[in-house]
Amino acid sequence: MAALSLKGVRKSYDGAQYVLHGIDVDIADGEFVVLVGPSGCGKSTLLRMIAGLETVTEGEIAIGGRVVNTLEPKDRDIAMVFQNYALYPHMTVAQNMGYGLKIRGVERALIDARVQAAAQILELGPLLARRPRELSGGQRQRVAMGRAIVREPSVFLFDEPLSNLDAKLRVQMRLEIQRLHARLATTSVYVTHDQIEAMTLAQRVIVMNRGYAEQIGAPVDVYEKPATTFVASFIGSPAMNLLHGRLSEDGAAFDIADGPRLPVAGAAGAGREIAPGREWILGVRPEHMTPLPGAALATLAVDSCELLGADNLAHGRWGVHDVAVRLPHAMRPARGETLPVALPAQHLHFFDPATGKRAG
């Protein structure tokens, strides 16, 4: 195991435009960090640079205190789990898991011991004699993980390993990856576009956007205190409601552009540096708009209501803005019904319209 450090890491393919812009992060020994973001944000490129599959244009990558910028992937003491499993179809599960060690010249007895140990961790013992075509998608992914485990690397790298699995299997594999990390405590970097994977697996999340690390923090902090409107809209399902408007001079009301006036008394309170009498983007998550006793209330004309099982999601509009409100299962307003919604001051977020950055 080893710490992983990225200092001012930048990437350019043509020497003119950068696809990664000065990534700085220190990942502790044994920490599980998730790179999350939409397609084209640079997360997979950054992972490939850590692995040695892409060159570093500027900056420094160090594993265990050793700078690895110029080292080949095989010399970095890393193991990678891919989206597409990359199993040899003519080999058994045991042969697939041990092949990397075999081509490195590791003794057969040690290979067998490591394969058996990994198979026990991943519950693959009864499958060791099978070939990939005889396995389910989840089993194949466990074999791919086992192949990485037998390497006993300093760092695990996961490149969207669950993307090919159905929803039920993704949940199962998330739990298995959590258990695996709890048992091995190996430094891990995991790439995904799925925010649920990011929130459930990570000790820290790096939210990527257009080649920048938009926010780095614990999942709960990223969710509760998004640094920018991008993070607020990307993390959370459904996304945070973001409303453009103007805070009144006394700070007690928020006038939505082409929409209603909302009561927000106390939201711009002491220490939040939210100036009244100017334009802001007001953010509030759907689950915080459920009517509660004592909360400031507004009204929303319901356009539709989605039944999600444990709860419901009501939709409407304030001016040009689509608004979603999460409701308990027993509340299912009909189309056209007027719904009272809460705007609790402690759950209101203000963002600068010019920069998109969080205030206070």
UniProtKB/Swiss-Prot annotation:
PROSITE patterns for the chain: ABC_TRANSPORTER_1, ABC_TRANSPORTER_2, UGPC
Source organism: Burkholderia thailandensis (strain ATCC 700388 / DSM 13276 / CCUG 48851 / CIP 106301 / E264)
Family affiliation: Belongs to the ABC transporter superfamily. sn-glycerol-3-phosphate importer (TC 3.A.1.1.3) family.
Top-level taxonomic group: Bacteria
Encoding gene, per UniProt annotation: ugpC
Name this polypeptide is given: sn-glycerol-3-phosphate import ATP-binding protein UgpC
Matching InterPro entries: AAA+_ATPase, ABC_transporter-like_ATP-bd, ABC_transporter-like_CS, ABC_transpr_MalK-like, ABC_transpr_MalK/UgpC-like, Mo/tungstate-bd_C_term_dom, NA-bd_OB-fold, OB_MalK-like
EC numbers for this chain: 7.6.2.10
Its job: Part of the ABC transporter complex UgpBAEC involved in sn-glycerol-3-phosphate (G3P) import. Responsible for energy coupling to the transport system.
Record has Cell inner membrane as a keyword: yes
Location in the cell: Cell inner membrane
Residue span(s) of domain ABC transporter: 4-235
A GO BP annotation: glycerophosphodiester transmembrane transport
Pfam family, any one: ABC_tran
SMART domains given in the database record: AAA
Lineage: Bacteria, Pseudomonadati, Pseudomonadota, Betaproteobacteria, Burkholderiales
